């Protein structure tokens, strides 16, 4: 709202681009619940076809891509967070895109011309820059991109086609490596830095100094504030949780509760669909085993992405919540689909499609069961205590 009005913003604990995106809905529909939630919901819907395309590229099977997309659509966190006016939706969206285009680059054959490699690298870097300017958690994902990038670079140079007569590596390899490295500095460092800095133009305009010096100064001052703010949060919260609790859905965050009507309750919470959370964790472990034993590139890709989003939280001492696990849901679903794909390779021994459809249907059934507490619909108190309180720490 402040950015739209051209005044200094009150809430400055995150980079501004996510709120600028949110402001598009407010400009279109006014300062109303529909207006401030519109863009988040739109991005939430947009994730689904993007994930489908990603899964189709990863595994090449329509049935797996469809079931993986349904798993995201049926995830509790996906519904809850994309309906709220929060920036977590944009972080997830851009993480999805930056990993998709990195995968497209990694799967290009060794010896592919620079021009063919440039586009997926550019798009991966572009969406990483946009994501980082929306929320810092996207920066965690960039660590995974860096690891994957250098693994891919090593493999492409190692497998570079040899000359048919001499058996020596073609001389174009060094030229290609120089071009790729120089281009990567541009698309993963310089362009994202420019996007990040330019996202602070509303700050500079509000302060009356839109010069380059004023823009950089406004950006830098906010970085210092954000670092101080996030490292200095010491307050407690009854629905906070630590990273090791996220792995098992131990503590949902309760956004709203109303017990004013006797015998009825209204709850509104964010947590991961148990099928995705628990099944996905087992699937990530399976991917880790396959990455080590079979040196499976797909499995390694998924494990690196998952760890890049999770491991930084090991070292963060400030109060945290279940929604911080939201970006990891992407890799839980990728891991589940990897397991489906692995089973499909043994279809003469295992009826993999019924198993995949059963898992997907189970997630959809839980989505229907828990729907009232994902959107804040009033329910009889017995419904929560008898059907929804699976763990003592679940606030239903």
Describe each model-derived feature in a short phrase.
Residues 38-59, 97-101, 283-287:
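Transmembrane-helix motifs of polytopic, lipid-linked glycan transferases
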Residues 59, 98-121, 150-160:
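Membrane-interface transmembrane helices that cradle and orient dolichyl/undecaprenyl
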Residues 15-20, 29-49, 66, 81-85, ...:
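Loop-to-helix entry region of an early transmembrane alpha helix in multi-pass inner-membrane enzymes
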Residues 46, 51-74, 93, 110-119, ...:
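Transmembrane-helix signature of polytopic, membrane-embedded enzymes
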Residues 259-263, 267-295:
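Hydrophobic, aromatic-rich transmembrane alpha-helices
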Residues 40, 77-90, 134-137:
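Short acidic/glycine- and proline-prone juxtamembrane loop motifs at membrane-interface regions
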Residues 68-73, 80, 128, 132:
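Short helix- or helix-capping micro-motifs
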Residues 116, 147, 153-157, 161-188, ...:
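Transmembrane helical bundles and short interhelical boundary loops of multi-pass, membrane-embedded
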């Amino acid at each position: 709202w402040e950015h739209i009005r051209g005044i200094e913003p009150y809430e400055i604990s995150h980079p501004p681009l996510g709120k600028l995106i949110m402001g598009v809905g407010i400009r279109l529909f006014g300062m109303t619940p529909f207006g401030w939630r519109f863009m988040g919901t739109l991005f939430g819907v947009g994730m689904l076809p993007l994930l489908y395309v990603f899964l189709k590229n990863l595994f090449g099977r329509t049935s797996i891509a469809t079931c993986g997309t349904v798993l995201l659509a049926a995830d509790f966190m996906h519904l809850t967070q994309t309906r709220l006016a929060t920036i977590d939706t944009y972080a997830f969206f851009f993480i999805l895109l930056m990993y998709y285009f990195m995968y497209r680059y990694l799967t290009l054959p060794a010896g592919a011309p620079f021009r063919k490699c440039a586009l997926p690298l550019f798009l991966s870097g572009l969406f990483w820059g946009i994501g980082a300017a929306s929320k810092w958690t996207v920066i965690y994902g960039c660590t995974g991109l860096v690891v994957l990038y250098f693994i891919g670079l090593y493999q492409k140079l190692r497998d570079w086609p040899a000359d048919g007569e001499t058996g020596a590596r073609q001389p174009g390899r060094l030229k290609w490596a120089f071009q790729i490295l120089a281009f990567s500095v541009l698309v993963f460092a310089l362009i994202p830095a420019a996007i990040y800095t330019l996202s602070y133009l509303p700050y500079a305009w509000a302060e009356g100094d839109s010069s380059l010096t004023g823009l950089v100064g406004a950006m830098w001052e906010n970085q210092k504030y954000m670092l101080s703010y996030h490292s200095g949060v010491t307050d407690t919260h009854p629905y906070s949780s630590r990273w090791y609790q996220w792995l098992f859905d131990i503590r949902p965050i309760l956004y709203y509760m109303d017990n004013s009507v006797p015998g009825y309750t209204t709850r509104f919470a964010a947590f991961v669909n148990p099928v995705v959370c628990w099944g996905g964790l087992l699937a990530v472990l399976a991917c880790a085993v396959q990455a080590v034993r079979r040196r499976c590139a797909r499995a390694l890709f998924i494990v690196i992405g998952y760890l890049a989003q999770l491991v930084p939280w090991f070292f963060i001492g400030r109060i945290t919540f279940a929604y911080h696990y939201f970006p990891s849901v992407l890799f839980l679903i990728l891991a589940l689909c990897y397991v489906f794909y692995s089973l499909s390779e043994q279809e003469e021994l295992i009826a993999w499609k019924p198993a995949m459809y059963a898992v997907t249907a189970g997630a959809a059934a839980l989505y229907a069961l828990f729907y009232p507490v994902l959107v804040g619909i009033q329910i009889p108190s017995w419904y929560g205590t008898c059907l929804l309180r699976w763990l003592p720490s679940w606030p239903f």
